[in-house]
């Protein structure tokens, strides 16, 4: 196991952020159970990457954002990844994700962070308000991966989180500027 990664889970209130984490990590979410508003919680999980390595991930479950409120500033420091959650039955929650993505882009400096977008409640087809093609087109233009998921189907949650853990813990590629032995101490890059 390598370093522990910090992932901030954010989105509008009542889109299912906590339910997603509870179902993913513990398999104990009951659809239709009473919603309790989250202030802020931390969940720790061990996720097997696509390389077969288990990585520890700390999920910062944030309070649902309401009425133009921004993500707290501490959510931007030392963060390796973000899970932006909207509900497929709420156009407003998708618009909030679009704003969050812009906020993250402004705040992340030059640091590389992995962003995954989840459209929750995809099983509620008759209440759908977010066109999946529009959402995928937006995700592609923003260079983020988007999955539609349902807390009722735990398997739908696995792929996005395996992708997230795998992407955040990719081995660093070799430097584009390898120094040969004879140059190491000279400070000169020419042979």
Curated annotation (Swiss-Prot):
> Which SMART domains does this chain map to?
RAB, RAS
- Segments spanning the bilayer are none
In its UniProt record, a GO molecular function of this protein is: GTPase activity
Q: What does this protein do?
A: Atypical Ras-like protein that acts as a potent regulator of NF-kappa-B activity by preventing the degradation of NF-kappa-B inhibitor beta (NFKBIB) by most signals, explaining why NFKBIB is more resistant to degradation. May act by blocking phosphorylation of NFKBIB and nuclear localization of p65/RELA NF-kappa-B subunit. It is unclear whether it acts as a GTPase. Both GTP- and GDP-bound forms block phosphorylation of NFKBIB.
Amino acids binding GTP: 11-18, 61-65, 120-123
Q: What is known of its domains?
A: In contrast to other members of the Ras family, the members of the KappaB-Ras subfamily do not contain the conserved Gly and Gln residues in positions 13 and 65, which are replaced by Ala and Leu residues, respectively, and are therefore similar to the constitutively active forms of oncogenic forms of Ras. This suggests that members of this family are clearly different from other small GTPases proteins.
Q: What segment(s) does the record annotate as region Small GTPase-like?
A: 1-191
Q: Where in the cell is it found?
A: Cytoplasm
- The entry's protein name is NF-kappa-B inhibitor-interacting Ras-like protein 2
Instruction: Read off the Pfam families from this record.
Output: Ras
| A GO biological process held by the record | regulation of tumor necrosis factor-mediated signaling pathway
**Record motif Effector region, residues:** 35-43
PROSITE patterns recorded: RAB
**Which parts of this chain are annotated as the region Disordered?**
169-191
- How the protein assembles, per its UniProt entry? Interacts with both NF-kappa-B inhibitor alpha (NFKBIA) and beta (NFKBIB) in vitro. However, it probably only interacts with NFKBIB in vivo. Interacts with GFOD1.
Annotated Gene Ontology cellular components are: cytoplasm
Q: In which family does this protein belong, per the annotation?
A: Belongs to the small GTPase superfamily. Ras family. KappaB-Ras subfamily.
| Keyword annotations from UniProtKB, A to Z | Cytoplasm, GTP-binding, Nucleotide-binding
Biological source species = Mus musculus (Mouse)
């Amino acid at each position: 196991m390598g370093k522990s990664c910090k992932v901030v889970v954010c989105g509008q209130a009542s889109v299912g952020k906590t339910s997603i984490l509870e179902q993913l990590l513990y398999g104990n979410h009951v659809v239709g159970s009473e919603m309790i508003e989250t202030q802020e919680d931390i969940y720790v999980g061990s996720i097997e990457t696509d390389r077969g390595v288990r990585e520890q991930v700390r999920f910062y479950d944030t309070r649902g954002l309401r009425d133009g409120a921004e993500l707290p500033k501490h959510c931007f420091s030392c963060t390796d990844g973000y899970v932006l959650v909207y509900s497929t039955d709420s156009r407003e929650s998708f618009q909030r994700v679009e704003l969050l993505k812009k906020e993250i882009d402004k705040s992340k400096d030059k640091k590389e962070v992995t962003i995954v977008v989840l459209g929750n409640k995809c099983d509620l087809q008759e209440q759908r308000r977010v066109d999946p093609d529009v959402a995928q087109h937006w995700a592609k233009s923003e260079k983020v991966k988007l999955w539609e998921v349902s807390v009722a189907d735990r398997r739908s949650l696995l792929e996005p989180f395996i992708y997230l853990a795998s992407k955040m813990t990719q081995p660093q590629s070799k430097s584009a500027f390898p120094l040969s032995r004879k140059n190491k101490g000279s400070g000169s890059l020419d042979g």
